[in-house]
Amino acid sequence: MNVMQENQIKLIEHIKQAVVQAVGLEETEVPEILLEVPKDKKHGDYSTNIAMQLARVAKKAPRQIAESIVPELKKDTKLIKEVEIAGPGFINFYLDNAYLTDLVPVILTEDKKYGESDFGKGEKFQIEFVSANPTGDLHLGHARGAAIGDSLANIMKMAGFDVSREYYINDAGNQINNLVLSAEARYFEALGLESEFPEDGYRGSDIIALGKDLAAKYGDKYVNASEEERRSVFRVDALAFETGKLRADLEEFRVSFDEWFSETSLYEENKVLPALERLRENGYIYEQDGATWLRTTDFEDDKDRVLIKSDGSYTYFLPDIAYHLNKLERGFDVLIDIWGADHHGYIPRMRAAIEALGYSPNQLEVEIIQLVHLFEDGVQVKMSKRTGKSVTMRDLIEEVGLDATRYFFAMRSSDTHMNFDMSLAKSTSNDNPVYYVQYAHARISSILRSGKEQGLEVSKDANMSLLETEAEYDLLKVLGEFADVVAEAAVKRAPHRIVRYLNDLATAFHRFYNSNKVLDMDNLEVTKARLALIKTAQITLRNGLTLLGVSAPEKM
């Protein structure tokens, strides 16, 4: 629990005791006391509507009740500096400045752990994201999903949730058959032999490179081999080549996974048919027109879904159900799937399947990643300058940088369409959101270096009561909100709230810096207090950027 949360608990308890004394209720009769942070700081640090909640019980006007509570509240002079009644009966609190200055040594001590909480303790989540087919490069939708999924996992971990990250490798089905046939054609081509390229084959430069690798590795060993033998070998090599490329690109993007789960393993370990039998035992399977159906309309889907077609082949839905059953059987309380915009219609049937398996539909959450459109100098960019083809994640990183790519993708809620301004992402001005935040961190680092050169080290024992300007306290207030913002972003599945917070923190720091001299050798005690203050801002900026997979540079 952080200092701000402790003070909120103290304040709530103090309000409860004031109500008991002023209104004559037993503690158990006092309704839940809600605290809000007013949008306008002129209305205090916190506000409560408890007087309005009590109006019916006390049979008095809310303002009259508030007037009886306030004298009791004013008896605590350690926490509360001022109390006022606003409007029809809101009670606004201005807390003593000490509650903020107490934050500084706490943040300095917790350092990289500042922002952590046990909010989500005891809940086990799995986040499955990206899960692109291993048949080509990651596109912009994958990149946005990777940034949001990884950031969300980081945020939820900091908020105390037990989180596992998973990539589902779609290594079964027709797309893999086409990959193997494409690799086979490029293998023959690399050996100077003619070969018909498959109609639905993959024509990317990576497949040409794969064909050359196969030719270099095997020579003409498989030219005259049977198709079954050759394709069986090439399947292994092709999947290793493509998944290796995906892993490398994601690692470069600072995205890692705890588990890479193979779809093929569902068949090898006999996980598919038992899932079907469980659905049958639960009474939701029926046969019609030679096909096997799941009655998803029992769970608000718009129509029933085919699991096994009349020719005996599986639809994509059946192994997907088996995979989700496998995840739940691994002990996860909640599954968070991050899907592309084209999968929106898939949500009702999958939630229906979860319920048909005997689980709560609330154990599956789906975050949809909406489309990304690139713009440069106001003009939409559809093709890569380098390749003349669709822009890939790798292209975007090379063009605007890794930090800007990660930060910009985290700036907007995942369910909103995004216009990615490449010109803005590359600019070195405060108009660029990531530059603005990183520059605040770099500026603090520069001041701390200058202080060190003059023999001034940051100390937890600095006299923080010497901080008394409005800008100093505004900065402290923002710093104190960090753990709550992290917890809120975790619960709302909203990494963009961290972006918004970092912008607010950078703004509070810049305002402080522009109105207060930090290094004042004629006033060393104040200087020491301000050095400690900006160090806490540096720590918090770094911790927030780290959640988003963005670096915190010490020089810019």
Swiss-Prot record:
> Which InterPro entries does its entry note?
aa-tRNA-synth_I_CS, Arg-tRNA-ligase, Arg-tRNA-synth_N, Arg-tRNA-synth_N_sf, ArgRS_core, DALR_anticod-bd, Rossmann-like_a/b/a_fold, tRNAsynth_Ia_anticodon-bd
What catalytic activity is recorded? tRNA(Arg) + L-arginine + ATP = L-arginyl-tRNA(Arg) + AMP + diphosphate
- Tell where it localizes: Cytoplasm
**Chief place where the protein resides:** cytoplasm
Which top class of enzyme applies to this chain? ligase
- Keyword terms: Aminoacyl-tRNA synthetase, ATP-binding, Cytoplasm, Ligase, Nucleotide-binding, Protein biosynthesis
One Pfam family matching this protein: Arg_tRNA_synt_N
Quaternary structure, from the entry:
Monomer.
Q: Which family does the entry's similarity section mention?
A: Belongs to the class-I aminoacyl-tRNA synthetase family.
Q: What is this protein called?
A: Arginine--tRNA ligase
The organism encoding this protein is: Listeria innocua serovar 6a (strain ATCC BAA-680 / CLIP 11262)
Gene name in the database record: argS
